[in-house]
């Protein structure tokens, strides 16, 4: 399924299956990809985020296929409906050249970096307070220990490619609409694309994607 109801059912099953780990202190993180690659299915990200946050879980979303142009998740007004972290691959549409192997993680300041040996007061999506220690932030817990930073040349390639990314993404979306609708008129071709009104995912596409455009 694509909506929050299907998610709630799946989450309940997972929580039950791994109840021993959850009870011993392990955390549940929700990882979503929307639009999904390669079919372009759109998930009800705001609805899923709200349900997950109500249960105290954190949400990570990869909208690489849609890009921030078609699916600007961080502009969602209600923080309960907004993911905690957003991931993007620079390698694909953002840079557009395919010459840069890189990605980005976007989150709130206190989740990304806290000065060493210190802590900060922050809030959960529901407004309740929490304390974030320095070793819980992304910089110290992941980047510093396990990953590297993008070098200057690759960063330049990404920034240079992003000058045209909105134009490229828009043209690709228009091409998808035209191609899907033309092919769907052929009696011997079965087209599965959310942009078609008869597709079961069409309503979510219209609701959550910019101008109802497909990725």
Give residue spans per PLM region.
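Conserved PLP-enzyme active-site core in the AAT-like
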Residues: 1-186, 192
């Amino acid at each position: 399924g694509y909506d929050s109801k299907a998610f709630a059912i799946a989450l309940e099953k997972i929580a039950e299956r791994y109840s021993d780990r959850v009870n011993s202190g392990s955390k549940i993180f929700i990882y979503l990809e929307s639009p999904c690659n390669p079919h372009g299915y759109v998930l009800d990200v705001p609805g899923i985020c709200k349900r997950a946050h109500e249960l105290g879980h954190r949400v990570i979303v990869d909208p690489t296929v849609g890009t921030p142009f078609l699916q600007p998740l961080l502009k969602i007004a209600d923080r309960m409906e907004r993911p905690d972290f957003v991931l993007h691959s620079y390698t694909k549409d953002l840079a557009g050249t395919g010459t840069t192997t890189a990605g980005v993680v976007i989150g709130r300041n206190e989740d990304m970096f806290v000065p060493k040996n210190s802590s900060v007061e922050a809030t959960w999506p529901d407004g309740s307070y929490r304390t974030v220690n320095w070793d819980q932030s992304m910089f110290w817990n992941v980047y510093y220990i396990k990953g590297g930073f993008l070098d200057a040349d690759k960063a330049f390639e990404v920034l240079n490619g992003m000058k045209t990314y909105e134009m490229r993404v828009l043209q690709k979306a228009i091409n998808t609409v035209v191609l899907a609708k033309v092919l769907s008129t052929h009696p011997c071709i079965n087209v599965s694309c959310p942009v078609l009104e008869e597709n079961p995912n069409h309503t979510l596409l219209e609701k959550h994607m910019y101008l109802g455009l497909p990725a």
